Amino acid sequence: MLRNLLWATSKHDVYLTQNYSVMHWSSMLRKSREVLNVARPVVPTLNSPGSMAQTVSRVQISTMTVKDNLMVAGGFQGEVMCKYLNQPGVAFCTKVATDENAITNSVDVYNNPSGAMRVITANNDAQVRVLDGGNFKCLNRFTFPWSVNNISASPDGKLLAVLGDSPECLLADAQSGKVVSNLKGHLDYSFASAWHPDGNILATGNQDTTCRLWDVRNLSESVQVLKGRMGAIRAIRFTSDGRFMAMAEPADFVHVFDTKSDYAAGQEIDLFGEIAGISFSPDADALFVGVSDRTYGSLLEFNRRSYDSYLNCIF
């Protein structure tokens, strides 16, 4: 599991997976409700000419993201589902890959330089697919030398960070798929990436238990190496203001760093259980951690401490 099964759209609204469902949790009402059930057949409501849309069922969700009211989820059999949170039904669903090991490892939603919304998927078949965010037609398909575990678009929509079963991480042009830079430094396979909101810093998480920070203005080597406690770095998130960065290990540990201190100041959150995902609220005041452990399954909320002067604790 690649640990991206949780997304906060506000300080009070969190979307997370539970069995064959995506649930919405309201921290204000202290209630949860089901917004998507994939145990039953899911029929797309949009089916424009040339669309790849098809019915899917019993989807085991492998990854998820939410942006601008659009939720995109991927499945273990190559499924992709797109649902507008303010509309009934699922707008689009299909199997983008049909290989035996075609898991959808990563999905992202971004706006290209002209402002058009794009949905991007990364699969174990070594392909990255770019879909139109309006009609969900496939616009581009990029092939890489290895299974792609994670993909993320830069804030300006011009670059894609492509990570997978290789120690090297790639930066590719989002329009053409052409590799523009090869990032070397990690020792094992990579699983996570995130862009600082200013677009200059890319963070990559690896099975070598480190997160490396790269400055896109000088990619000759990483500018920082942040170490985890004992496991691979499986998820990375920045706050919307860029002040904090969080990274999660497969289980038990989430690390929060203060970017203003050049990542020197931080806090380690020690918990019990497998980590399903991490997400900051858009206002940067809350950090949510999903725990998928059978015994300790839960959703944890950490609130940012506010003081007149900076003290030791961040969250």
Tell what function each PLM region has.
Residues 165, 179, 206-207:
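Active-site cradle of extracellular carbohydrate-active enzymes
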Residues 184, 194, 200-315:
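Structured C-terminal portions of repeat-based eukaryotic scaffold domains
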Residues 1-166, 170-172, 182-184, 227, ...:
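WD40 beta-propeller repeat fold
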